[in-house]
Every structure is written in C-alpha cells, then in structure tokens.
C-alpha cells in the first residue's frame, strides 16, 4: 500500500479505494462539497477496482442515436470482486456504490420529473433571515430507498400541487448526501466514459456553418506609432505621467507569464492582480480549476475540485442571499472535465472557458442531481440559496456541455438557470442523446427576472431549452435534432432574435402556464420571434390559447421550410398557419389587445411590415436581411497586439486611491499602440473625468468597477461626466466589455457615461456586458443604512446621479449582450437632464456657416431641460401636467435659466444676421414664452395655473364660463401674457377670449395682436401635403367643409389645430385640407359600423381601416362625433391602393378572415341556439367541455368583439364561464345581420357610391 495526499482535497479513485475523511462535509442540492482541510488517504493498487472489467459496457451504454427505440435505462454494475472503501469510517463495497447510484437514479427519474411538472414561480419578497438561519443551508438528503422510489409515482401531480402543508412538496427538494456523491464519483472513475464520436460536435459545427456568416472577433485600429514592432519607443503620455514602454525584461510586471495552465489564452497566463478591496486579504478573484486539482482528462472525476475552486474564500453561498464583495472568475483550460454531481455557481461568479479551445463539461453515466451546472440551490419548495429575482451578476461562456451519457430517464439538464439581471450564457454547445424517449434537456429555467443568452447550439435531447422568466432576450440560438427545440412555459416578455431550428420534431412550444402549489397561473405574456428559420421540422410552432391568459405572439422575418404545419393551436387539427415547402413571413401575429372599450382577442393576421434601415441589418439573411448583431470580442488571438494591465502601470483599484490620472495615462497610450487595456477586478476611484479615446479596446474582469466620487460630481446644477467615450465628432473604434460603472455618494451631479463616438464600420463602437449601478453596494455610501427607504426628509447625499448614460447627438453606440442599467426607482429632488439643441451643425450647417463664431456658439447651446419643454415649440395653450413631479422638473430654476440664457444671448449676438426668412432667436423666443405661461403659479397656494384651469367646469363655449373661473387670476393672466409676447399662441381666437374677460371682469388693457415674429427657415407650418388650403367662412362646420371637399371630418379636425370647436369655426382661418376620399358618407345618430358596412356591401372592419380613429369595437363612433363630426371616408384617402401579389415560391401566406359568411345556414341538428344569438349566421359552433371563447374565435376566424355582438348572452369579462355546453353559437354572421329587414313588399334601396358625398339616412 502507498499513501497519497491531495493537497486540495481531490482524490484519484483509480488508485485510491479507502478514504478516511476527518473533515465535515456539507450536503447541498445536487453535489457534495468538501471544504478543504486535512485528510488521511490510504490506497491500494489498480487491479482491485478494475478487476472483472465487463461492467464497463453497461455503465457506458450508447443509446440508439436517431433510432425509434426507447432509451435503455443505465445498468450500473461491477464484477464479483467485493472491493470495499472506507467512507467516514464505514466500509462501503463498490458493489454497494453501484446499488446506491442505481436506486438514486430511479428516484431521480421520478422526483426530477415532478420538479419539471411543478414549476416554482418567482417570489417577489425577501425572506426573514432570522427565520431561515440553519434551515436554508441544508435540504433533506435524497431518499433513494427502493420502497420510496416505488411509492412516489402513485402520488399524482394534482395531489402534490394541492398539498400545501403535507410532505409532498418536500419530496421535490433534496440534497446529494456525501455517501451518494462518493458512490457516483467512484463509479465515474472506475469505468471512465468512452471517447466521444464527435457526431454532436460535427452536427453543431455544420449547422452553424450552413446558416451563419463569418465575422471578425475584433476591429484592430492602426497604431499611432509606426515602428517595426510598434513598441520600440516610449508611447506619448501626459506630462509628468509614468511613460509606458514594452517592459519585457522585468519580472512580475504584468507581461504574459507562461504557467502550467494548459492554455494559450493570454488571461490564463497573465499575472493575476485582480483583488476585491472589501474582501479579506488574500482573496482570489481569478481561480484556475487546475490549481485546485482538476485534471480535465475526461477520466478523473473533477466535481470536488471544481466546486472547491468556486467556493474558495468564504464566498456567498448557502448562508448568503447576495454580495458584491466576493466576485470570482473560475477559469477552465481546454480539456474534458468529468463530473458526477452538480457544479454550483455561486453569486457574482463567472465560469470562463478557454475561448480558443472550448473545454467540455462531461457528465458521467453515474451523474446524480438535476442540473450539471446550477445557479441556485433549492432547500425548500419555495426556498433557495438566492431569491431568484435577485440572482444577479453571473455568466457562463465558452463551453461544451455533454450530458449524452447521463441516465436518459432521470430528467438531467446541462444548465439549471434561475437568474436575474446582469447574467448571460454565451458560446455554449449542448450535447444530448438523440434516442427517442430520452428526457435530457439543455437548459431548464423555471423562474427569474431577466438576462441574456447568445450563440448557443443544442443537439439532441427531449427539450433543447425549457424556458420561463420575466423578461429575457436571446440571440443566435441553434437547435438540431431535438424532440422539441424549446418550450416557453411563462414570461412577461421575451424577444428571440436569430433562431435556427433544424430537423427537430417540434420547433417552439408555447404553453399557457404550468401548475404547482404556489402557481399564480402565469402564462406566456408575449413572445416576439425575429429573424428565424424553422426547417425540416414537422411542426413549426405549437401554442395553447386560453381566454383568460392568451399568448401574445408576433413573428417578424421568419421562414418555414419543409414544415408540415407552420403554427398550430392546441386541440385544433387544422393549423392556424399552414406549412409547406416554403412559407415566408414578413410580419404576423395574434393575441390580446386592449382599448377604451375593453380587452379583445385579435386572431392571426398579417401585420404592417417595419422597414429596416440599412444601418440596422447585417449580412446574415434567412428571409430578408437579419438585424445586425455582433458578439463580444474574445481577443483569443491577439496577433501583434499587446495587453496592458492597468495595475501593472500604477492603477490601484483599491477603492481608496484616486486612479483618474493613472487610468487616463494607460488609456491614452494603449489607444496609440492599438493595445488591449485589461482592467483586473478592483474598485477604481475616479475624481474627475476618465477619458476613453477613439481606438480603445477595454476588457474588465468580473465587472471591474469604475467608481466616480468627489466634489466634481456633487453639484446637481453642474452635471459632470465620469467616463467620456471619445470626443464630439470622433469616428472610429471603441470596444468595451465587463465593466461596472458606479458611484460613491454624494454624486447628484454625476453623468456616469457620455458616449460621443460614432462607428467607422458597422458595430465598431460597442459596449458589451457592462452594467450601471448606483447605490446598493459596498463602498457606494448609498446603501439602505445610509438612505432609508421611508425617510421623513430628503437626504441630499442620497441623490445618486444626474444620468446613467448620455449618447450625444451624432454618436452611435452598439449596446448589446446584457448591459444592465440599475438605479433607484424613486426620483427625488431637482434633476438635470440630457437636454436638446435647437440648432446643430449636423442639421443646420448651411445656416450656421454664415454666422459669426459667437453667434454660432450661442445658437448651438444646449437647452438643459426635460423633453416635455420641447412641446412649447408647438405654440398652444399652456400644458397641464397634473403631475407635480413633472411640473417641478419643467419649471425648475435650472431649466428657466437655460432657456432664458439661450434667448438673451442669441438676441444679443445674432440680431445682425436676422433676415426676412431667418429670425435667429425665433425658436428660443417661443420656448421662453411657453415656459413663462406654463410655469405661471396661482398666488393662492402656489398651484400651477395650467392645473388650475384644467380643473374648471367643462363648457362648450367661453361665454358659458363661470365668472369665478373666467375672471380668475390664472385665466386672465395667461391671456394677458400671451397678448404681450410676439412669440406666443395669441391670435384672433384668443383675442376674442381676452375681450370677453375685459367685458365681464371689468379689466382694461391692450388686446391687439402683435406683429408676429416669422421664421421660415425651418418651419413646417407653411407646408400643406395636399396642396389645398381653404379659408373658412361664416357658418362653416367640420361636417360642411368635409362634405364640400369630400374629406373626413375627423381628419380635418385632427390636422387643423386652428379649429377648436367643429360646430363653431371662426371665419378667416387658413386651413390645410387633408387628402380627399373618392367617397364620403354622413352618418346619422343611430348608425353603427355594421350598418354602414352593410349598406355599402363592405367586409367587416373596412370602415375602421378607412377611418382609423374608430376603435376595435366601434363603440366610439357616436360618442366622438361631438368633436370629430359625422363625415366618414368610405374609400381610401388619396386614391385606392392595389396590393402586390405574393412573391414567387411563397405558399400559404396568412391572411385575415373578416368573420362574415355569405349566406345563412341552419343551426346544427339537435342543438339549442344560445339565448339572443342571431339567426343570420352561416357558421355555427356547438360548445363542448374545455372550450374557451378565445379558442372558438380562433377556430371560427371571428374577432372577439363581433363574436360577442352576435352572441349577446356572452360578456367580455366572463365569456368562457358563460358558455352553455351543447348550445349553438354563431361564429360567422352574414353581412347585415344587425339590420331590421324591411317587408318583402318594400324593395330595399340600393346604395350607389358616387364621387360626391352620400347621406343615406339609415
């Protein structure tokens, strides 16, 4: 015998059979973690454990790839040799280990299945820490006794969901005991996996090559110093700064140090200087799993080594809900890492695989647990290590996840992902069994509140991805030969862009929600599928629809190729979108929508197609060009570039030292040298602006913090930029990733990032995986203890920032890959704003070029006000915001000073350049007049006059106003101020009102209209699209003008702000008429959309399309006629449009059904027509069990509002519950179903559409 010692607690069971552990093991869900400490190890030779090796074939049985047979359960067996191990002093035979694992897998096949079927939805509250200490750490060990395994399937899912107090919910929660973890490990090493055939990798590679265009990893700017090596001289730096040279001869200075990392990746070989200033001394941010004993040889079980690498340093695990103190990057060099129980990713952790050669995480056939990688640990049915909606800051990227060898019946998933904002999965291949009946899944996600996934490829499996989260974004997902590519079982909103589904059974499965004892019935809120292709797949998309919980589903730029059924609804045999060899969709969707009349269901329809500007599309194309995307640069092959570690050149990142100058020096030099700036983890204090020049490429580590603090960021009235990206007018390259921009308060004046640069090539100026956080973290001085949520008074030191990010005019920023902007939800105190410009070089270059420099400076000055003030340029009655917060921001002293200064300076410095066409201060004058009128306050109580006036009693004419309101300070003063300003809205209409106030209120003063200031340089008011300007005369109304000129009275009113009352139009107004219709119709007081459409022989919905102000249920037709008049267009404005035929090769483009039929038919035999249902019906539906109104509408192709109209026994709120089984409901009324038919002896008047107005008097 020989003794072996593994310093990190990692034992190789090829050589070790007897282990006496003298340290305490912590059982957690899915893996056994052994804290590193001393141990005694005793070993014997290989022959004992490897004797009678025929058991190998059973352990590594290969499933029938692509075959039709059910997967064979894994048989774990060993030979007759009764080798034994010592486990915690208890002898355990290898045969016993096989038996333990076999029983456990049988139990897991049941309990994991129940976990999938009993979804745990989000919790939105934090637990009381005092109540969970000691309980949260440990779940009960998996009970894998044979009696339990056999009895559990007899408990139905329904019983488990209803049993809130019993033990059934606890049966879904388990931990892997030390005994079971050890047994799984012994078997994994005693019979190592056979080498991969490479089939899955080939499939993944071939499909990606088939559909994706190649792209460069990075854009390399040219070096400013052009020498043979680019580094032969000192770089130009700021005065008094340390010169940066290529110091390759100095030891331990940040150069590339070749270590035994088995990786060529520069980060793995760089001296690791990353440190958390708030963690204990010696805490490691970067940890290479091989430094902790992992082998990566595909033979040694690396589970314990990996988990030790993750947990090292007393990190935020079982007894910690969250932490910003202990970040970690866990690096995996190339290799194959065999694991037999789950790898637990701690809070604030990155798993980073070698980007040049992705490592493989290989799950053993003896794997026990649910997820090979898991982001949260269940310790109760609703209790986990971390609150799932608060599970921030984690990523996994650059891996191959191989679970093909795991038990096909145990519902194992490669990644169990329960996460929130600031999280990502990137560059991962998932390999699963392709045998029929297997239960393996790539990703299992049941809850969370946000995140991002990109560049993922799924091969095989029961589900490629099983998804549920609040709001999520994915890009470049590929599914190959999965039974179901992905299922989305709940969300609030999900955007899937760039999806490829090839040779699967079903493409996408959308469900209305799963059960569970704590379920809220949450279903899929909405899903948008953009730039996708589904090919060689029998069923493209399957969805279940529920009247109370209907999926809202939109497709844009999607192609179905060789798909039998493109989209089908559950329980219906006919697809709602037929398949074919080639079905191309520009824009299509269905779902619930709401308006003032209620909530309605819109069945499948073509939708207006968004025109994609060239700047937004890339080279990839499935149907039409896809939206442009760019993956984050990996810098895995630097070529001639140099990595500059900022800590090697003076930056401290210690959360105390001012690093502004050191960082600016490095950034300036690196940009000159075209080098990569590496910012190891740390908290880098900046007390002035950090300047990122054009040509910068910056990479952080575990979200290195750039923390603004100090006097320059404290003044709320003088915002100061913390990080400035380029200068105004710059064009070129900037690449930034893995930074966290933050503050240490008080920083009321901080603008965290100002982005000025514009891309030189598509996507060359970008920001990836970088976050903005103000408050709520160690060192911010803005935590709960500093800024209590319900403080009685405002603490000005708790105003965290002026702005998180400002993208200046003329800049372009490619912000992608999970950038998170986190700030307090409450806006308190005064604020400064991004503002806007009234004139700029890009828009007004010709005008500005003829002005003096002083005048140009004055005219291009920023208006530092909220966007609401921009509306003042429209000149109108003062806006009532009915919101004190908005009003106080608009009427702040800072906004007033900004507008007043602009107006006065332009008036002073630019008057000499005024011409008949161009009055330089025109726009500023309008703004200034608008501000003064809007921000006028009542002397009684200080309420804004616009709000006071908004509360006056409604009247039709000013003469009907109460004297107390007409003669009030606010009303009379607003009119007087308007009369005094040549820039205001004051005209003949308001002159009449001012005269009225003087007559009734005993006031005196001028009422004449001042000569208006004109500016025709850029004023659209003199533009008339129809080229028809009409001058009103006495007696005109909207209806009379509309009938005379064959236009819509509503279009006239909406497009003519001069018209205040459609029934009382002041004469002498010059009005630009809208485009005319060929035919108009004046409708009477009893008309409905249906009666009008019937009279003209129109399909249902045509009147609403021609007059889009009418709502979906036509309920506002009569109500809004008071304002809009009574004249409708019954033909298109500006002529009739003829639709183009579909492009060649397109089959079954979806259309929209009007819901009407051509002729009446009798109700089905032996059925009773529902009470009140119309008999003018050509299509019927007999209600049956499990029907919903939404499903009936989809099947019948009828809009929900029309369905309710023809079946009045049903209501919008309770439609489904009011359905009577066996009753017949009309789902296809005939045209004119609502009309009272005349006697047969009286011929019905024919309606003839002419080129004149029609008044049929229905």
UniProtKB/Swiss-Prot annotation:
SUPFAM superfamilies: Pectin lyase-like (SSF51126)
Pfam families: LysM (PF01476), Pect-lyase_RHGA_epim (PF12708)
Free-text disruption phenotype from the record: Leads to enhanced fungal virulence, with faster decaying on infected fruits.
Domain commentary: The LysM (lysin motif) domains are small globular domains involved in binding chitin in eukaryotes. LysM1 contains one LysM domain.
More about this protein: In plants, chitin acts as a microbe-associated molecular pattern (MAMP) that is recognized by lysin motif (LysM)-containing plant cell surface-localized pattern recognition receptors (PRRs) that activate a plethora of downstream immune responses.
Its job: Non-secreted LysM effector that might be involved in manipulation of host defenses for successful infection.
Lyase found in the keyword field: yes
Taxonomy, superkingdom: Eukaryota
InterPro entries in UniProt: LysM1-like (IPR052210), LysM_dom (IPR018392), LysM_dom_sf (IPR036779), Pectin_lyas_fold (IPR012334), Pectin_lyase_fold/virulence (IPR011050), RHGA/B-epi-like_pectate_lyase (IPR024535)
LysM domain sequence ranges: 1028-1073, 1179-1227
Similarity remark: Belongs to the secreted LysM effector family.
Any GO molecular function: lyase activity
Record's compositionally biased regions (Basic and acidic residues): 157-168
Region (Disordered) residue spans: 148-168
Entry keywords, A to Z: Chitin-binding, Lyase, Repeat, Virulence
Protein name as catalogued: Non-secreted LysM effector LysM19
């Amino acid at each position: 015998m020989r003794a072996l010692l593994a310093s990190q607690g990692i034992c190789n069971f090829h050589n070790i059979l007897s282990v006496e552990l003298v340290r305490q093991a912590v059982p957690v869900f899915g893996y056994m973690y052994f804290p590193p400490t001393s141990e005694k190890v005793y070993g014997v030779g290989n022959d004992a454990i490897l004797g009678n090796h025929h058991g190998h074939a059973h352990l590594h049985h290969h499933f029938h790839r692509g075959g039709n047979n059910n997967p064979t359960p894994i048989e774990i067996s060993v030979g007759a040799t009764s080798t034994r191990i010592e486990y915690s002093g208890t002898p355990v035979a290898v045969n016993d280990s096989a038996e333990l694992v076999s029983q456990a897998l049988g139990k897991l096949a049941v309990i994991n299945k129940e976990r999938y079927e009993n979804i745990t939805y989000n919790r939105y509250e934090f637990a009381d820490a005092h109540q969970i200490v000691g309980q949260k750490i440990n779940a009960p060990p998996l009970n894998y006794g044979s009696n339990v395994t056999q009895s559990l399937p007899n408990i139905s899912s329904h019983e488990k969901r209803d049993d809130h107090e019993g033990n059934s919910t606890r049966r879904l929660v388990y931990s892997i005991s030390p005994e079971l973890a050890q047994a799984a490990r012994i078997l994994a090493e005693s019979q190592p996996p056979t080498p991969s055939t490479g089939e899955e990798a080939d499939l993944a590679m071939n499909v990606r090559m088939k559909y994706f265009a190649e792209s460069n990893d990075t854009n390399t700017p040219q070096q400013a110093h052009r020498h043979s090596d680019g580094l032969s001289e000192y770089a130009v730096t700021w005065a008094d700064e340390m010169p940066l040279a290529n110091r390759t001869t100095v030891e331990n200075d940040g150069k590339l140090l070749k270590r035994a990392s088995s990786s060529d990746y520069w980060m793995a070989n760089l001296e690791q200087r990353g440190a958390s200033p708030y963690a204990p001394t010696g805490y490691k941010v970067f940890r290479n799993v091989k430094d902790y004993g992992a082998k990566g040889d595909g033979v040694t079980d690396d589970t314990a080594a990996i988990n030790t690498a993750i947990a090292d340093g007393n990190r935020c695990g079982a007894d910690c809900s969250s932490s910003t103190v202990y970040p970690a990057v866990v690096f995996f060099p190339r290799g194959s890492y065999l694991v037999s129980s789950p790898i637990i990713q701690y809070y604030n952790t990155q798993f980073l695989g070698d980007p040049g050669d992705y490592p493989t995480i290989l799950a053993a056939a003896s794997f026990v647990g649910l997820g090979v990688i898991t982001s949260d640990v269940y310790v109760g049915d609703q209790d986990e290590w971390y609150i799932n909606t608060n599970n921030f800051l984690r990523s996994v990227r650059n891996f191959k996840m191989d679970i093909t060898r795991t038990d096909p019946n145990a519902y194992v998933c490669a990644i169990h992902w329960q996460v929130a904002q600031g999280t990502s999965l990137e560059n991962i291949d998932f390999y699963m069994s392709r045998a029929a009946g297997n239960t393996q899944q790539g990703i299992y996600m049941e809850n969370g509140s946000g995140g991002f996934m990109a560049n993922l490829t799924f091969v095989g499996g029961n589900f490629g991805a099983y998804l549920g989260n609040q709001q999520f974004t994915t890009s470049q997902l590929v599914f190959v030969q999965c039974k179901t590519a992905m299922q989305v079982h709940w969300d609030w909103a999900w955007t899937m862009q760039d999806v490829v589904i090839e040779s699967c059974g079903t493409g996408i499965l959308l469900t209305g929600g799963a059960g569970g004892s704590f379920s809220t019935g949450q279903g899929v809120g909405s899903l948008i599928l953009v730039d996708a292709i589904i090919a060689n797949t029998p069923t493209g998309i399957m969805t279940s629809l529920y009247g109370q919980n209907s999926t809202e589903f939109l497709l844009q730029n999607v192609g179905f190729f060789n798909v039998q059924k493109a989209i089908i609804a559950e329980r219906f045999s006919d697809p709602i979108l037929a398949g074919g060899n080639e079905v191309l969709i520009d824009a299509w969707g269905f779902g619930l929508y709401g308006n003032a009349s209620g909530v309605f269901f819109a069945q499948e329809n073509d939708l207006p197609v968004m025109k994609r500007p060239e700047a937004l599309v890339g080279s990839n194309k499935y149907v039409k060009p896809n939206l442009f995307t760019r993956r984050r640069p990996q810098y895995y092959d630097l070529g001639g570039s140099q990595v500059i570690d900022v800590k090697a050149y003076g930056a401290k990142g210690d959360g105390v030292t001012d690093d502004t100058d050191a960082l600016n020096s490095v950034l300036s030099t690196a940009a000159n040298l075209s080098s990569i700036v590496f910012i190891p983890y740390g908290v880098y204090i900046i007390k002035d602006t950090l300047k990122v020049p054009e040509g910068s490429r910056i990479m952080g580590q575990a979200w290195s913090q750039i923390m603004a603090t100090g006097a320059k960021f404290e003044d709320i009235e003088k915002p100061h930029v913390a990080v400035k990206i380029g200068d105004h007018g710059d064009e070129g390259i900037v690449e930034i990733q893995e930074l966290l921009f933050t503050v240490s308060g008080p920083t009321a004046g901080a603008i965290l990032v100002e982005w000025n640069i514009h891309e030189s090539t598509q996507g060359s100026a970008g920001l990836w995986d970088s976050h903005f956080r103000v408050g709520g973290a160690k060192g911010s001085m803005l935590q709960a203890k500093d800024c209590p949520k319900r403080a009685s008074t405002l603490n000005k030191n708790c105003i965290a920032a002026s702005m998180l990010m400002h993208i200046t005019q003329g800049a372009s920023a490619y912000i992608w890959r999970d950038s998170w902007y986190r700030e307090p939800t409450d806006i308190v105190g005064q604020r400064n704003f991004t503002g806007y410009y009234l004139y700029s070089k890009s828009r007004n270059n010709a005008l500005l070029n003829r002005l003096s420099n002083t005048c140009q400076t004055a005219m291009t000055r920023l208006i530092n006000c909220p966007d609401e003030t921009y509306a003042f340029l429209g000149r109108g009655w003062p806006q009532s915001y009915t919101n004190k917060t908005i009003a106080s921001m608009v009427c702040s002293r800072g906004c007033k000073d900004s507008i007043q200064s602009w107006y006065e300076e332009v008036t002073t410095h630019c008057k000499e350049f005024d011409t008949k066409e161009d009055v330089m201060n025109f726009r500023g004058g309008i703004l200034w007049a608008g501000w003064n009128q809007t921000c006028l306050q009542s002397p009684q109580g200080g309420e804004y006059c616009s709000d006071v006036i908004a509360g006056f009693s409604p009247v039709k004419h000013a003469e009907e106003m109460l004297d107390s309101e007409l003669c009030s300070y606010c009303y009379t003063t607003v009119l007087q101020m308007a009369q005094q300003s040549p820039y205001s809205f004051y005209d003949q209409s308001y002159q009449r009102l001012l005269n009225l106030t003087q007559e009734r209120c005993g006031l005196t003063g001028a009422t004449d209209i001042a000569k208006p200031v004109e500016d025709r340089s850029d004023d659209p008011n003199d533009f008339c699209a129809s080229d028809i300007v009409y001058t009103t005369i006495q007696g005109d109304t909207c209806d009379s003008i509309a009938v005379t000129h064959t236009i819509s009275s509503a279009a006239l009113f909406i497009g003519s702000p001069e018209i205040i009352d459609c029934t009382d139009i002041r004469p002498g107004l010059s009005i630009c008429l809208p485009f005319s219709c060929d035919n108009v119709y004046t409708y009477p007081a009893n008309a409905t959309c249906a009666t009008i459409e019937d009279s003209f022989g129109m399909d249902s919905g045509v009147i609403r399309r021609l007059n889009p102000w009418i709502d979906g249920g036509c309920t506002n037709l009569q109500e809004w006629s008071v304002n809009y008049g009574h004249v409708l267009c019954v033909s298109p404005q500006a002529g009739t449009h003829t639709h183009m035929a579909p492009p060649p090769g397109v089959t079954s483009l979806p259309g929209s059904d009007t819901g009407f039929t051509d002729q009446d038919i009798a109700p089905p035999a032996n059925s009773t027509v529902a009470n009140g249902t119309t008999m003018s019906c050509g299509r019927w539906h007999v209600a049956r069990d499990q029907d919903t109104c939404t499903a009936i509408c989809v099947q019948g192709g009828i809009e929900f509002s029309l369905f309710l109209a023809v079946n009045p026994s049903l209501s919008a709120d309770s439609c489904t519950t009011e359905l009577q089984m066996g009753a017949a409901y009309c789902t296809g009324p005939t045209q004119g179903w609502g009309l009272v038919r005349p006697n047969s002896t009286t011929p019905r008047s024919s309606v003839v559409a002419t080129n004149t107005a029609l008044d049929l008097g229905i």
